[in-house]
Amino acid sequence: IAVAPDLEAISALSPGPFGGNMDVPDVRPGNKVYLPVWNEGALFYTGDCHARQGQGELCGVALEITSRVTVSFEIIKGGGIEWPRIESEDRLMTVGSARPMEDAARIAYTELIGWLEDEHGFSRLDAYQLLTQAGGLYVGNMVDTTYSLVASIDKQYLVRG
């Protein structure tokens, strides 16, 4: 699931800020995916759908299927996100894609800290501390040209008192 990147062309195997081949199991029905947009009309595309995939897509393939996908779109003007975000009923998640893996983790956590700051009233330091104590991190893709990692926080921790 992706939009056209701010590049002339990119391999369909490569994930990045635009989404792409992230191989993240949380990109699934019922969850919202937020993507930054660089081109008029976004030029959205989807593919490589899986019936099932473990974290990391260890052997390079998941349970690959043909699929018919129905999506709905909402334009959020001035959203200002830099990397894909995923929202489920109970978690906020951000995706970072890079090599080495540490860079992917850094991107994912930086984006999640920004989300907590911008939309949930946390200071940068408080968001960093919260993720240190209650955040999650998993590998979506570790077999393609670029690794994808997902940083997350349960929404129960977003209640400020």
Which residues does each predicted region cover?
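A hydrophobic, small-residue-rich beta->alpha segment in the mid-to-C-terminal subdomain
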Residues: 77-130
